[in-house]
Amino acid sequence: MSGNPGGFKPRRIKGLREIAAMTARRALGGHVFSAGALGLAESADWGLARLGKLLPLRVRCPCCGYQGPSFLHVNNTKKTSWNAACPMCDSRSRHRGLSLMIPDLLRRREPHTRVLHAAPEAVLRRVIEPIAAVYHTSDLRMDGVTYPGEDLSRSRLPEASYDVFLCNHVLEHIRDDTAAVAGLARTLVPDGIAVVTIPGDFKRRETKHFDDDSFGGHWRDYGRDVLELFSKFFKVVETVDLHELDKAPGGLSHGIFPGETAFLLRGPLPQPA
């Protein structure tokens, strides 16, 4: 399975021996409490894979159609995300929310919508490409994209060429996010929209900055002050609560977390030459 969430590939369920070995290694590395959470999350996934058909349906993935009693649990040294990853397509809460929001967004625009998708995830590509007039992609390291080797903070993308720019959990990986947001704005037509999701706690005022990107490639964990950054480059900054899209048919849940937020950045502002 690809390490990139949303790769439209089933997640591999680990065996009990592998879980025990992983847990021991983390504990010996000094992360004792995190090791316990890892063992619990992976063991719960192991049990779900074997007993899930006996349990009542509670969730449905809008990206691939999976239905089951729960999504899988994802753990790292910082936290555990319960009921997070689809076992069939590896979508996360943000992918599932965007897969429901973006089609409606595109339908509201003119029929010839040109979309640029940074660091494209297969689960979202399957949703967007069929309904976009033009669907292009960019990435710094990924092969098979329209614009390979593209660093948004040193953008070489064509200016004023796209109607919608999707940037899903990308900015936190870029050291100079101010330059990256400027790059988003330059790429859009005057009435264009950037759809941005980022990790953070938006009840917290300030963004937490890290000394390096050793935590999953992240340079920061955003706070509400990101709105000030967006407002430097866009006329309108809209906050969308994706959790409002959580209800699936039959009383099921799409597994879209409370607080799952997307930002719609409308109308790029002119930038100095």
Where are these regions (language model features)?
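Membrane-proximal basic amphipathic "stem/tether" segments
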Residues: 1-58
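Short beta-strand micro-motifs in enzyme catalytic cores
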Residues: 57, 82-85, 259-263
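Short cysteine-rich clusters marking metal-coordination/redox-active sites
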Residues: 61-64, 86-89
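Cys/His-rich microdomains that often coordinate metals
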Residues: 67-68, 93, 122
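Short linker/helix segments within small regulatory modules
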Residues: 72-83
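Conserved alpha-helix/loop element of class I SAM-dependent methyltransferases that forms part
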Residues: 85, 91-112
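Conserved SAM-binding loop
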Residues: 109-208, 216-233, 262-272
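Core SAM-dependent methyltransferase catalytic element
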Residues: 235, 240-273
